[in-house]
C-alpha cells in the first residue's frame, strides 16, 4: 500500500474512532488518538484512565461482507469467512498496553446482524485472542461489546 493510501486510511480510521469514542461516551478532552503502523495496532488511544491500543476492522468492505452473505464463498487466499475472522482475532500485535478490536461498519443492513452473529460465535467458541475487548460500532450508532464470556448491546447512539 502506498504511503498516501496509508495516510488516507489512517485519517479515516481516526475519524471513525472519534465517532465511536463519542458514541460510547468517552470524553474527548485530555485524550490523544494516534495512528500506528504495523506491527502495532491501528490506533493508540491515550487517556487519563490509561492507554489502550485498538485494531480496527472495517466490515463493509466487499472482501468482508460478500462472504457473510454466502458462507460458501472462498477468499483468494483460500480462507473461508470464519477463517478470515479468526485470522484477524488471533493476529499477534506488538503492544505493551491492552489491545481492543473495533469492528465497524457505516450502513445498517441485515448483514450487520450476520457480522455480529458470525463474530460472536467465533469469540464464544475460540475466545478473544490477544484482545481484551471486541467492540462493534455499526450503522445508526449501534454499539456492542464483547469481553471474554459476556456480550452486551450498549444503549448509546452516535
What are these regions (language model features)?
Residues 45-47, 138:
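Short acidic, glycine-rich loop/turn motifs
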Residues 50-52, 100:
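Structural motif
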